Structures are given as structure tokens and as C-alpha cells.
Amino acid sequence: NVLDRVYDTYGSRKPIIVSESGCSYFSVKKQTDITDFVVKQMKDYYTYLPIKYPNLKMAVLFDREDAGGRQFLLSRNSAVLKAYKSGITSSPRFISDPSSQPPAVYYSELENWYTVPAAKVELCSYISEPLNLVDYVIYTVNGVPTTSYSIPYTVSADFSAQAGKTVTVNVQAFRNDMVVSQETFYLQVTQ
């Protein structure tokens, strides 16, 4: 993923702008409409941009027809246009008024012995899986499972009672009731 490489190299010290990106909703190779696939990819894209790339300042999409037959014109496909509009308006992180401020939300990638506050926090998952074929994610926090069924697979976890303790968080992603990915984290809860 080119964006991962650019972000990993510069994201911690430079603002990032993605220009000239887009999803053609017509496959030239197969000569078929792939609107449903593009709508899902667009939903994933706008859901995960502020989570995975919090220092990304702007993402600009193509809005034109390609001479090679690829279709990027948003206004010509109502489903893709609707997904685009929903993507940019559903998150408070995307602002339409430059003088307004997005909410103070911070995302951190979990790793073992990561420190979390003794408070209620939200956990979410970014699962790198071909075609993102995940039906649901189960988070088990100190033996108590909670399930989320849609991206970004968010659940609330209250660490208030675990101040000064180590908490075990097991995350399992499922497809057709079979585990496709899992990871366990040991987190330090602050006093």
C-alpha cells in the first residue's frame, strides 16, 4: 500500500494530502460494472482514514471519465456518489468549515504493554484482509466478550476498575463463524 509507505515515512512529522485518488466503478478488463465493490471500498476508505492515518489532512477523488474506459465520474453513478457523500459527512473528523475544529479524538495502535487510562475507552479494529471479508469481531476483555458487526468494529471497554492492573484484550475477527485473524494484547491501566 503506497499510502502506508508515505504515511509511515512522513506522517509523524508532516501533514499528508492524498490527491488524484479514486475507484473506477467499471472494470475495463472484465467489461463489467463493479459498483457494489466500489461502494464497499469507499465506505471502508472513509471509515478508516481518520483511524489509520490521523495526520492526513485532505483526500481528493477523481471526478472524471478516463479515456481508457474507466469510470471515475461520481455524478454519473448515484450509488457511488451516495457512498462518497456519506463517507465525508458521517465522520466528525471530516470538516466542511475550515474555521471549525474536529472533536478531540485520538487513535493509537495497540501493542503489548501499551498504557491505557483507567476510564471508558473505545476499541476498534483495522483488519488487513483481502476484500475485507470479516463478518464480525469479538473483543474479550479480561474474559468478558463483546461483539461488533460493522466497520470499524467498535466496542466500549471500561477500564475504571482495573487501575494499576494489567488487562488482557483478545481480538478475534470472524468470517462464516471461523476465525480469520486474532491477536492478544496485555495492556497496562494507569492509576
Provide a role label for each language-model segment:
Residues 1-7:
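Substrate-binding surface in catalytic domains of secreted glycosidases
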Residues 14-102:
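Substrate-binding cleft of secreted/luminal carbohydrate-active enzymes
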